[in-house]
Amino acid sequence: MCEKSQTIKELLNAIRTLVVKNNKAKVSMIEKELLAFVSELDKKFKQQLNNFNELQQKIPLLQKANEEFALKFERMQREAQNQIQAKLDELNLKNKKELEQAKKYAIAKTLDQPLNIIDQFEIALSYAQKDPQVKNYTTGFTMVLDAFSRWLEANGVTKIKIEPGMEFDEKIMSALELVDSNLAKNKVVRVSKSGYKLYDKVIRFASVFVSKGNKKS
């Protein structure tokens, strides 16, 4: 009985020893796993810390880039506004000039009748030199003609001065006919109807006879 009890005790001790050994092995395995996990966490933490440090180093560069972009955008915006304003000023100036030009030359449409009246008086005065009966009215005709001329000049209308012998100029003259003359070719022989300008614009071309330049004395 005593031997059996001893054997059982030994067996129990062996089993207990085996369990303890197995537990230690299990604890050691768990400890290793924990250490590996902690080591991995430490690596990841250090990596994140490095990333954070790199980001902190980049922040001033990013801030500088942001400031430079803001300044560039502000400069571009200012230049765009200046260009737009310049274009508006140009359009306003153009419209103003066009309006002034329109006002300046608006009277041109109303000048036909006054110019025709002047033509009639000039014709009458030219005949007055030849007809004694009409010559008595010369003073009155001249006064009316002068009054019309002053009114026209006050409104920017001037007669184009053309004399026989002048070179024909298509910019201010209209040729009625080419005629035989002692004058050189392309010279004005006679003015049939006076031409007029409104400021610097021709509103009526002078009607003239032009020399062929082939008449022999």
UniProtKB/Swiss-Prot annotation:
SUPFAM superfamilies: Coiled-coil domain of nucleotide exchange factor GrpE, Head domain of nucleotide exchange factor GrpE
Keyword DNA-binding in record: no
Cell compartment(s), UniProt: Cytoplasm
Record GO biological process: protein folding
Record Gene3D superfamilies: 3.90.20.20, Head domain of nucleotide exchange factor GrpE
GO molecular function: adenyl-nucleotide exchange factor activity; protein homodimerization activity; protein-folding chaperone binding; unfolded protein binding
Keyword Cytoplasm set for record: yes
InterPro entries xrefs: GrpE, GrpE_coiled_coil, GrpE_head
Pfam families named among the record's database cross-references: GrpE
UniProt keyword annotations, A-Z: Chaperone, Cytoplasm, Stress response
GO CC terms: cytoplasm
Entry's family note: Belongs to the GrpE family.
Subunit structure: Homodimer.
Record function comment: Participates actively in the response to hyperosmotic and heat shock by preventing the aggregation of stress-denatured proteins, in association with DnaK and GrpE. It is the nucleotide exchange factor for DnaK and may function as a thermosensor. Unfolded proteins bind initially to DnaJ; upon interaction with the DnaJ-bound protein, DnaK hydrolyzes its bound ATP, resulting in the formation of a stable complex. GrpE releases ADP from DnaK; ATP binding to DnaK triggers the release of the substrate protein, thus completing the reaction cycle.
Protein name in UniProt: Protein GrpE
Gene of this entry: grpE
